[in-house]
Amino acid sequence: MSKQLPQDFVMGGATAAYQVEGATKEDGKGRVLWDDFLDKQGRFKPDPAADFYHRYDEDLALAEKYGHQVIRVSIAWSRIFPDGAGEVEPRGVAFYHKLFADCAAHHIEPFVTLHHFDTPERLHEAGDWLSQEMLDDFVAYAKFCFEEFSEVKYWITINEPTSMAVQQYTTGTFPPAESGRFDKTFQAEHNQMVAHARIVNLYKSMQLGGQIGIVHALQTVYPYSDSAVDHHAAELQDALENRLYLDGTLAGEYHQETLALVKEILDANHQPMFQSTPQEMKAIDEAAHQLDFVGVNNYFSKWLRAYHGKSETIHNGDGTKGSSVARLQGVGEEKLPDGIETTDWDWSIYPRGMYDILMRIHNDYPLVPVTYVTENGIGLKESLPENATPDTVIEDPKRIDYVKKYLSAMADAIHDGANVKGYFIWSLQDQFSWTNGYSKRYGLFFVDFPTQNRYIKQSAEWFKSVSETHIIPD
């Protein structure tokens, strides 16, 4: 049966500066944590990505043509402050003014993220989110952006704090590529929430009239079996990846049960508890009571079973199905039940997880007034057909099927009371992936990276229909 979305529901595509812009050495842009890391790996480069730095008008024109009312973009901090602080690069400032003006020209509202995994290199070397200097410079950068880019009405402080901290210090897939350091993970998580809170409180004090939120990666965690030990493993995983953030940003405090689970993980790894101050917790509480919205990035769900060995993680970075391993000391082991479909990158396809996380926010965190689904989509191995012409439409039925199921689950959550106001598909166009390079394609628009030519995918036409009719077909 088809399902109806509210008439004021907005839809669009999502991007991130480092993944789409390219031009990493142009117009005075400073280096970021990824530049040296990717150079040393030698697997793939962030240039040209989707060359959005030069082709943003082409992509925004496509977005408008295919029914998008909104877009997620991020500001590359190192385009504004090449060193993270100090001298401003006017060419970077001018670029974002042009980008936002072009959004307006195409009748698309930008939701603008201040930090999307791209810490300036100097601040990364100073400790990244473990450094007080980083926090202070981030707040100063945010203040500059709020004053400079008054045309922006929707701000996002940080994209996926959990992904940043866990992949930097627990699984080691993001630079500095440390693993098993749960103490650093939780401290970085807390510090990100402090920075987020300071920025929310600053923005509200400036009375600029816009809205501000945060984006979380929220993958619903289920027990692998009905056993008590598997239920507890799921609770531990949830505390690591979801619960601490939800508490801090949406409740304004860390609930005692959450802290007990965090301490259990740290004790099992013989590592100390993260540090916080009363002043920091006051800022966190104040921000939670002023937050305008939360963004939910949901792609897959996890199932956890009890595990008592050493941590072992293998990241599936090339689409070899079944190659990923995730076992964390003091937490548990990820194990998919029989019958759960996965992508080539071992991400489960489980729309019920979308429903459950949206209802959890609605039921457990009533302070936040509005939710957006700020990322959802499926990465596929796709190629340009031989003899393709500019009019070629690339068939991607798997993407349509995936998005239809997740949109349907989201519509059910709206029906049951969740105040979800919009959906951003990941991604607008094919992009560069942090850990997969160019092999994993998410876009509604196919990018032939050697030529940078754009081609329409069938999913873009389907997306346009849903956006314009507000009806999710059978």
Swiss-Prot record:
Keywords: Glycosidase, Hydrolase. It holds the Pfam family Glyco_hydro_1. GO terms for cellular component: cytosol. D-galactose 6-phosphate binds at residues 19, 116, 159-160, 297, 433-434, 440, 442. The active site is at residues 160, 375. GO terms for biological process: lactose catabolic process via tagatose-6-phosphate. Belongs to the glycosyl hydrolase 1 family. This is 6-phospho-beta-galactosidase.
